Amino acid sequence: MKVKVGINGYGTIGKRVAYAVSKQDDMELIGVTKTKPDFEAYLARERGIPVYAASEEFLPRFEKAGFEVAGTLSDLLENVDVIVDATPGGMGAKNKALYEKAGVKAIFQGGEKAEVAQVSFVAQANYEKALGKDYVRVVSCNTTGLTRTLSALQEYIDYVYAVMIRRAADPNDSKRGPVNAITPSVTVPSHHGPDVQTVIPINIETMAFVVPTTLMHVHSVMIELKKPITREDVIDIFENTTRVLLFEKERGFESTAQLIEFARDLHREWNNLYEIAVWKESISVKGNRLFYIQAVHQESDVVPENVDAIRAMFEMADKWESIRKTNKSLGILK
């Protein structure tokens, strides 16, 4: 029997999760919500996805445009087993009462505080902790990226120091910035380090900057080691870590631009690069310190985590069975 899934919020993350759910043989996409009849709503309808108004207050917008919706969020909740909340940060916590009243399990995104859910989730790091849970939070794109590589190295970690170089806005966002500035997060740690600690128990400090680009985030990671490891060991670990790929500058991957072009060349939906990209040349061990640089596609790296979270919550598969199914369905390279 397939798990019935609804998506509350059909934007950058919501539409990608909807696509991913539609590719699973053990899930059924029941519908998505929108606050207005914009081009995304029309495209969803053309793709055969039932569109619901996010609440009754938004119905006049659809009526004015002659856009017939399948109902409201309340109607959607009556027909699903789980709702993926992909609304803007902070809205998920407000929506939780609706999900509780409807008796529906819910997945929240990283824009929500950890307290909104019973567990913060990255599949390869703590899948088992989400088994049977009613409320799970998939952590943010940056936290997911850090957790993927750090969890693979966890036994070697004494202390992590990481700098987040964050994109200013998503490609479709014409309202955010900066356009001609670099904006530091002046408090230390930035929120990313404490967020990683909601998934894996490590010592970590983070700093962050926002720069004028839309393509990806970049992380500069330095780890103080508690036991020896060689560069070759790290390369071997990353080569055998799911959803992490090594890229080489000498093969043309000089920047995030080429990484996104790689995703385009793979004919990925929306240029999705689900995998965390680590520059192989950046991996360096100096004494008891390990260094590497990685890039995170902020629009898509959390998408497979949402799919795996559904399976964990309904105990549909064990960790590696779920990861394998999700990876295969989305064309994730390893």
From Swiss-Prot:
<feature type="binding site">
    <location>
        <position position="167"/>
    </location>
    <ligand>
        <name>NAD(+)</name>
    </ligand>
</feature>
<keyword id="KW-0324">Glycolysis</keyword>
<keyword id="KW-0520">NAD</keyword>
<keyword id="KW-0521">NADP</keyword>
<comment type="similarity">
    <text>Belongs to the glyceraldehyde-3-phosphate dehydrogenase family.</text>
</comment>
<dbReference type="GO" id="GO:0047100">
    <property type="term" value="F:glyceraldehyde-3-phosphate dehydrogenase (NADP+) (phosphorylating) activity"/>
</dbReference>
<feature type="binding site">
    <location>
        <begin position="192"/>
        <end position="193"/>
    </location>
    <ligand>
        <name>D-glyceraldehyde 3-phosphate</name>
    </ligand>
</feature>
<feature type="binding site">
    <location>
        <begin position="12"/>
        <end position="13"/>
    </location>
    <ligand>
        <name>NAD(+)</name>
    </ligand>
</feature>
<dbReference type="GO" id="GO:0005737">
    <property type="term" value="C:cytoplasm"/>
</dbReference>
<dbReference type="Pfam" id="PF01113">
    <property type="entry name" value="DapB_N"/>
</dbReference>
<dbReference type="InterPro" id="IPR020831">
    <property type="entry name" value="GlycerAld/Erythrose_P_DH"/>
</dbReference>
<dbReference type="InterPro" id="IPR036291">
    <property type="entry name" value="NAD(P)-bd_dom_sf"/>
</dbReference>
<dbReference type="InterPro" id="IPR006436">
    <property type="entry name" value="Glyceraldehyde-3-P_DH_2_arc"/>
</dbReference>
<dbReference type="InterPro" id="IPR020830">
    <property type="entry name" value="GlycerAld_3-P_DH_AS"/>
</dbReference>
<feature type="binding site">
    <location>
        <position position="111"/>
    </location>
    <ligand>
        <name>NAD(+)</name>
    </ligand>
</feature>
<dbReference type="GO" id="GO:0006096">
    <property type="term" value="P:glycolytic process"/>
</dbReference>
<keyword id="KW-0963">Cytoplasm</keyword>
<comment type="subunit">
    <text>Homotetramer.</text>
</comment>
<dbReference type="GO" id="GO:0051287">
    <property type="term" value="F:NAD binding"/>
</dbReference>
<dbReference type="InterPro" id="IPR000846">
    <property type="entry name" value="DapB_N"/>
</dbReference>
<dbReference type="GO" id="GO:0004365">
    <property type="term" value="F:glyceraldehyde-3-phosphate dehydrogenase (NAD+) (phosphorylating) activity"/>
</dbReference>
<keyword id="KW-0560">Oxidoreductase</keyword>
<comment type="pathway">
    <text>Carbohydrate degradation; glycolysis; pyruvate from D-glyceraldehyde 3-phosphate: step 1/5.</text>
</comment>
<dbReference type="InterPro" id="IPR020828">
    <property type="entry name" value="GlycerAld_3-P_DH_NAD(P)-bd"/>
</dbReference>
<feature type="active site" description="Nucleophile">
    <location>
        <position position="141"/>
    </location>
</feature>
<feature type="binding site">
    <location>
        <begin position="140"/>
        <end position="142"/>
    </location>
    <ligand>
        <name>D-glyceraldehyde 3-phosphate</name>
    </ligand>
</feature>
<feature type="binding site">
    <location>
        <position position="298"/>
    </location>
    <ligand>
        <name>NAD(+)</name>
    </ligand>
</feature>
<protein>
    <recommendedName>
        <fullName>Glyceraldehyde-3-phosphate dehydrogenase</fullName>
        <ecNumber>1.2.1.59</ecNumber>
    </recommendedName>
</protein>
<dbReference type="InterPro" id="IPR020829">
    <property type="entry name" value="GlycerAld_3-P_DH_cat"/>
</dbReference>
<dbReference type="GO" id="GO:0008839">
    <property type="term" value="F:4-hydroxy-tetrahydrodipicolinate reductase"/>
</dbReference>
<dbReference type="Pfam" id="PF02800">
    <property type="entry name" value="Gp_dh_C"/>
</dbReference>
<dbReference type="GO" id="GO:0050661">
    <property type="term" value="F:NADP binding"/>
</dbReference>
<dbReference type="GO" id="GO:0009089">
    <property type="term" value="P:lysine biosynthetic process via diaminopimelate"/>
</dbReference>
